[in-house]
Curated annotation (Swiss-Prot):
Disulfide bonds: C156-C190, C157-C175
Subunit structure: Homodimer. Part of a complex composed of CD19, CR2/CD21, CD81 and IFITM1/CD225 in the membrane of mature B cells. Interacts (via the second extracellular domain) with CD19; this interaction is initiated early during biosynthesis in the ER and enables trafficking of only properly folded CD19. Part of a complex that includes MHC class II/HLA-DR molecules and IFITM1. Interacts with IFITM1. Interacts with IFITM2 and IFITM3. Part of integrin-tetraspanin complex composed of CD9, CD81, beta-1 and beta-2 integrins in the membrane of monocyte/macrophages.
Originating organism: Bos taurus
Name this polypeptide is given: CD81 antigen
Taxon lineage: Eukaryota, Metazoa, Chordata, Craniata, Vertebrata
Residues under site feature: Important for interaction with integrin: K116, K144, K148
Length: 236
């Protein structure tokens, strides 16, 4: 015997929420793949300075997002199917998966908040080391290539000190030239551009995480209410 009345409304409401959750998983998976293959981040994070690769903390986070998106799509499908079939077993499994996902999201959110500036800091240190080598050593071709890639990708020049900026503009054409010396001298520094690049992407990820967390809370409540409704309906 199927559920009736308010419980039936909850059943279809849970189905709708799960469909939205499934779509959200697809969006997160798509955004993560876009961030993974975004030309700006790819150009910078594939660089190597001698034996030292560029910091890969950002990509670790992206791979986690890809996994989360795929799991969300699976869990969303499980919830849709469990709601339509009115299966207590599937709904219980769905609820357990949601609790685990929610706990992981909270833990990841805390870690991300604590380390939100670390990614940009690591990339800036990598850039500063390459810039220093390129300025000091005329034969540091690898360092020059790294610096020029930063400058051309971000359309910036030098770090956040005027002395380094002026030196790097005048030294070995490391900065992209606009044909105007004054414009080159006052081109935005790369530290600001690096902060802008990563803070924008982290902001996007944060909004997505909050939306998903709200949906998950509603789904956990609805799945338990529906599960209880199914159990009660089978008694009568």
């Amino acid at each position: 015997m199927g559920v009736e009345g308010c419980t039936k409304c909850i059943k279809y409401l849970l189905f709708v929420f799960n469909f939205v959750f499934w779509l959200a998983g697809g969006v997160i998976l798509g955004v993560a793949l876009w961030l993974r293959h975004d030309p700006q981040t790819t150009n910078l994070l594939y660089l190597e300075l001698g034996d030292r690769p560029a910091p890969n903390t950002f990509y670790v986070g992206i791979y986690i997002l890809i996994a989360v998106g795929a799991v969300m799509m699976f869990v969303g499908f499980l919830g849709c199917y469990g709601a339509i079939q009115e299966s207590q077993c599937l709904l219980g499994t769905f609820f357990t998966c949601l609790v685990i996902l929610f706990a992981c999201e909270v833990a990841a959110g805390i870690w991300g908040f604590v380390n939100k500036d670390q990614i940009a800091k690591d990339v800036k240190q990598f850039y500063d080391q390459a810039l220093q080598q390129a300025i000091v050593d005329d034969d540091a071709n690898n360092a020059k290539a790294v610096v020029k890639t930063f400058h051309e990708t971000l359309n910036c020049c030098g770090s956040n000190t005027l002395m380094t900026l002026t030196t790097s503009v005048l030294k070995n054409s490391l900065c992209p030239s606009s044909g105007n010396v004054i414009t080159n001298l006052f081109k935005e520094d790369c530290h600001g551009k690096i902060d802008e690049l990563f803070s924008g992407k982290l902001y996007l990820i944060g909004i997505a995480a909050i939306v998903v967390a709200v949906i998950m809370i509603f789904e956990m409540i609805l799945s338990m209410v529906l599960c209880c409704g199914i159990r009660n309906s089978s008694v009568y």
